[in-house]
């Protein structure tokens, strides 16, 4: 299920996602989404709630919902009245965590941490160690979409084991609320005073907001008086502005594909022979030749002997590029791939391989030819490719690039970020600016936003840690602490689970994105070094 928005704004420490007509704003709370409509003529706007509810262990029981209600009562949370008579929304489950006193404590969070062993067992059908994280949604910044999951993601906090949700416990639901929970009411007071109201046409019809249904089932409407309404109250009929729209995947040829087709050249296998009959493109065997012999072929004192003038110029050019980007073995330069235990020329080879594999222009074929000439001329024996070594090198650089781009995408979700003095070097600042501009230019379906100095500084903070070789998660944690955007840690955690060899459209899209990010960083670094601006 998807909810679309056009822009974001910070108001009272809450991230609000504002719709195109500026008459509705969403915010995230404990894995659920609350929707607040603009008030009209002293009448409050429609309030709605979307998200997963917990139900029971079978199709007709409500054991889990009743358990949560019972625990809430035992903990003295009588003012919390879950919506509906049968289901309990995920943000009410948050309140069973001893570290959470009200919905206010889980504002801006996409997930719920469950420490209750009994409840965790209900959700996973397995005895678990204490602490599972249940994710109910994600915000897709590149599409400006809030995606609510039909089935949650459940991960053990300690072991990172991913569980399969129990089949009957969770369901996606939609509810109309008479009011917000008392702890959240103050957060939206005066919200629309800072959002200009659109001019209504004379023949304006009742407004509608589309809810795109992407799963097999539409969210179940729940009628009730809950959300802390202060009493049972009489039930009454309401007319919602939300209209459910079923998404149907395109069948047959299309002018625009949602994702590039998978590149089978290297993603299907790490066995080099499997790519021999593939369409023209770099193979892992070619990468291994360069990986194994490039340092000798390009760095030896007599590496130029027997080469043509053009080849000698190419050898010197590759040596210079490797030094400008990655430094030397004894004095590495702060740049992407710093955590990889590779020589500068090996990093350069992997860098160009990833770019060239996505059919982008790169000098990788020339590098292969030069190394091939050297091995033939000197009779150098090249052993069979070491698949794990190649996979680690490719995935390391692939994930670094994807983490940098994903962080930029997450930061661009926010039109306003907290102003802080974040010192970054000129090289990193240039990389950050170029990457943000590239990502903003790819978002063709949405209005272009303004890249602020804060965007540049905070992405620069991420890149600085990454370039120092301290790891992607360290960089994400550091940036999350600076910005308060905790979703950075989860997003980079998702990147760490991706592979440059994943199959399908999603894998192909990730490889295309990573190659694009690497291409941008390469271009800006070499351009700055050519003009003597690198420090």
Curated annotation (Swiss-Prot):
May participate in DNA packaging/capsid maturation events. Promotes efficient incorporation of tegument proteins UL46, UL49, and US3 into virions. May also play a role in capsid transport to the trans-Golgi network (TGN). It comes from the Viruses. Residues 251-279 are annotated as: Disordered. This is Tegument protein UL21. Keywords: Host cytoplasm, Host nucleus, Virion, Virion tegument. It comes from Human herpesvirus 1 (strain HFEM) (HHV-1). Interacts (via C-terminus) with UL16. It is found in: Virion tegument; Host cytoplasm; Host nucleus. One of its GO terms (cellular component) is viral tegument. Belongs to the alphaherpesvirinae UL21 protein family.
């Amino acid at each position: 299920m998807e909810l679309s928005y056009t822009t974001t704004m910070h108001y009272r420490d809450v991230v609000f996602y504002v719709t195109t007509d500026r008459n509705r704003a969403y915010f995230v709370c404990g894995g659920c989404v609350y929707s607040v409509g603009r008030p009209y003529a002293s009448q409050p706007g429609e309030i709605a709630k979307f998200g997963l509810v917990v139900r029971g262990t079978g199709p007709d029981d409500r054991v889990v919902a009743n358990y949560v209600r019972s625990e809430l009562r035992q903990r003295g949370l009588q003012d919390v009245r879950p919506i509906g008579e049968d289901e309990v929304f995920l943000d009410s489950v948050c309140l069973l965590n001893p570290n959470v006193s009200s919905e206010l404590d889980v504002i801006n969070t996409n997930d719920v941490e469950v420490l209750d062993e009994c409840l965790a067992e209900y959700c996973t059908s397995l005895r678990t160690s204490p602490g599972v994280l249940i994710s109910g949604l994600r915000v897709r910044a590149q599409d400006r979409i809030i995606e609510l999951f039909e089935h949650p993601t459940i991960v053990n906090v300690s072991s990172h084991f991913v569980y399969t949700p129990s089949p009957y416990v969770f369901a996606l639901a939609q509810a109309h609320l008479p009011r917000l929970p008392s702890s959240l009411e103050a957060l939206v007071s005066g919200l629309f005073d800072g959002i200009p109201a659109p001019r209504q046409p004379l023949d304006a019809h009742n407004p509608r907001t589309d809810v795109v249904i992407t799963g097999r089932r539409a969210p179940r409407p729940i009628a009730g008086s809950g959300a802390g309404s202060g009493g049972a109250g009489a039930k009454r009929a309401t007319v919602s502005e939300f209209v459910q729209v079923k998404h149907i995947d395109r069948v047959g040829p299309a002018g625009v594909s949602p994702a590039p087709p998978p590149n089978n050249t290297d993603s299907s296998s790490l066995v080099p022979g499997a790519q021999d009959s593939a369409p023209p493109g770099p193979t892992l065997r070619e990468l291994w030749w360069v990986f194994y012999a490039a340092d000798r072929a390009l760095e030896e004192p007599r590496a130029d002997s027997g080469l043509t003038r053009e080849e000698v110029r190419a050898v010197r050019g590759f040596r210079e590029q490797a030094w400008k980007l990655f430094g030397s073995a004894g004095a590495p330069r702060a740049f992407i791939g710093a955590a990889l235990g590779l020589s500068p020329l090996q990093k350069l080879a992997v860098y160009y391989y990833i770019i060239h594999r996505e059919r982008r222009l790169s000098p990788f074929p020339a590098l292969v030819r030069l190394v091939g000439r050297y091995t033939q001329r000197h009779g150098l024996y090249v052993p069979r490719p070491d698949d794990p070594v190649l996979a680690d090198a490719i995935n390391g650089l692939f994930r670094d690039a994807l983490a940098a781009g994903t962080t930029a995408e997450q930061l661009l979700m926010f039109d306003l970020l907290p102003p802080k003095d974040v010192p970054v070097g000129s090289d990193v600042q240039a990389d950050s600016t170029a990457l943000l501009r590239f990502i903003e230019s790819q978002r063709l379906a949405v209005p272009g936003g303004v890249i602020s100095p804060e965007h540049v500084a905070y992405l620069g903070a991420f890149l600085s840690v990454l370039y120092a070789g301290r790891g992607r998660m360290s960089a994400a944690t550091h940036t999350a602490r600076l910005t308060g955007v905790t979703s950075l840690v989860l997003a980079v955690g998702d990147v760490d689970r991706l592979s440059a060899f994943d199959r399908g459209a999603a894998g192909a899209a990730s490889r295309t994105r990573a190659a694009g990010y690497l291409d941008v960083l390469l271009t800006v670094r070499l351009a700055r070094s050519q003009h003597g601006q690198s420090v």
